[in-house]
Amino acid sequence: MSDDEPLAIAYERHDRVALLLDTIRYVLEERSLSAEGWDDPQCRGPGMYLVVVSGRSVAEHADPLGDNRWPVEESRDVLADPGAFAAAAERVAYECDGTGVVSVDGVVQERMVRFRDPPSPGGEYADWMGTRHMSALDTSRRDTVIAALTLSQESGRVTVFRDGTYDSVEREAIAARWRAD
C-alpha cells in the first residue's frame, strides 16, 4: 500500500511508532551507559539487535535462531510497561543472540531470528560495523521494516537504521549534554 492510498498508514511518520522507536533507543542507550569495562578489550558488553516491522510476519526473510527467545512472560509490549521492557532487554542483551522482532503496535515476538540477506544487499558499510550492524543496515532496506536498532557489544555504540541509512551515537556521546562528568 502506498502513501497516496486513502487507507495507508505512514508508520515511519506515525506518532505512536515514533514513541516506540524512541523508547527502544533510550533503553539501548541506558544499557550502554550502565555497563562497565568498555575500555577493556577482554570485556564483552551487552549487545542487541531489534527490528520494528509493519508486516504480519518476517518468515519470508528470517529464520528462527535456535532456542533464543524474548522473555514475553516478562515483557510482551514495549509501550505498555517500558520498565519491564528495559529489564527484559538487559537480560536478552547478555544472554541471547539473534534479532528481536517488534511489531509497530509495540508487541515483541517471542522468537529471536536471523534475517537473511536481501536479494541485493548494498550500501556502504562503515569501518566500525560488525556483522550485526551490516545486517541491520541491509535489513532496514526491506519494505516492511520501519527501523533496525543495534547496541554494539564491543563499543556501546547505539545505532538506528532506516531505509539503508543510519544515525549512530558512540557511547561517549550518549546523553553527553545532560551528564555532569
Language model features with spans:
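Divalent-cation
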Residues: 2-181
